[in-house]
Amino acid sequence: MAKTNISVILPVHELNEVTKPMFQNAIQSVTDQTVQPDELIIVVPKGSETAKYIKDFDFGANKKLVVIAENDGATDFSSQVNYGVSVAKTEWFSILEFDDEYAKIWFKNVVDYRDAHTNVDLFLPIVIDVDSVGNFIGFTNEAVWANSFSDELGILDNNALLTYQNFNIDGMVIRKSTYDEFGGFKPSMKLTFIYEFLLRMTFKDVRVMVIPRFGYKHVNQRPGSLFSNYKETLDPVEAKWWLSTAKKEYYFPKDRQITYESQN
């Protein structure tokens, strides 16, 4: 079977009886790909019960792809992804959340578009958003295919991002060297790390294309998730502060460890 030169980075900070079936579905969505990734890197907290569960998990057809990366550092999403990228051996990588799923032909579409658009370093899917029980909520990333949204149809640019923030990097496929060169995710950006990352990439003239195909199913703000729990503690003033901070921090390639408390 053809390979893609892509590693899947799958961060897992904790699993429970609700999320274990979701994790199984996420793994199955990798198995079902018509074109397979080269690696499935599962990042877990070192020495944790989650690490033990993952080590004992039956990966079936994916077994030869699996790399279990035990991280003894921070367990937030950004830090886990950054750690996974550091051990990846492929030219490209993709991000899969443990409660989400790829569409079956996502990597085939990536390979086809990558071959046709050799100057693009970051590909995004059109994301189907669902709630925690699978009910449809809406789509994300499709806006770049609307006329006059950005300077070039299908390409996300910095000017468009400064006026419209609703984009998702889940499922993205990015050249590893580009991610490393421009700093990766910034853990301190908490609420707006996705937005800041895309602003930074486009500011650095990284070409970001949304492939006009449904490529990823995302569970939006699942109760109990790290992001959902964090948002519940926010007031509108802090939420607005994170948005404005992202628009300032994207000029800096490295995380400056900014916190809301230290700036207010």
Residue ranges: model-predicted function:
Residues 71-88:
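Glycine-rich, basic loop-to-helix element that forms the pyrophosphate-binding segment
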Residues 107-139:
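Conserved donor NDP-sugar-binding/catalytic core segment of glycosyltransferases
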Residues 190-197:
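Acidic donor-binding loop at a coil-to-helix junction in glycosyltransferase catalytic cores
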Residues 214-221, 227-259:
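Catalytic core of nucleotide-sugar-dependent glycosyltransferases
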